[in-house]
Amino acid sequence: MKRSRLLLIIINYIYHDNIYLMSPIVDWNLLDVLNKNIRNNYKKIRPILLKWQENGYIKLIEDNEIAFSFILEKLPSKEKLIEESLNFK
């Protein structure tokens, strides 16, 4: 599965009904529910997640249970996050 498609799945989840306000934690089980290909292709999206972390949007945890958590105060608009993510080289 393409990196851009995987990222859009995650971004759409983040901003769906402001779900990030209910729980800023994204665990591996949730990623599996969103799309089974995310965990298998995690290496494809990890560089962008590292960029998100560098920008202060998320904190990568990457333990056995939790993939990452959002930093709500720093999270940009959905449109900005999509633009930054899809333009990442």
Regions found by a protein language model. Name each.
Residues 53-63:
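A short, conserved structural fragment
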Residues 73-89:
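Short, amphipathic alpha-helical interaction segments positioned at domain boundaries
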Residues 65-73:
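Minor-groove-contacting beta-hairpin "wing" of winged helix-turn-helix DNA-binding domains
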Residues 1-22:
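Short alpha-helical segments that sit at the start of domains
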Residues 38-54:
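Short amphipathic alpha-helical interaction segments
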Residues 20-34:
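Short acidic, hydrophobic short linear motifs in intrinsically disordered regions
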Residues 3-7, 27-31, 42-45, 78-79:
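Short amphipathic alpha-helical segments that mediate assembly, nucleic-acid/protein binding
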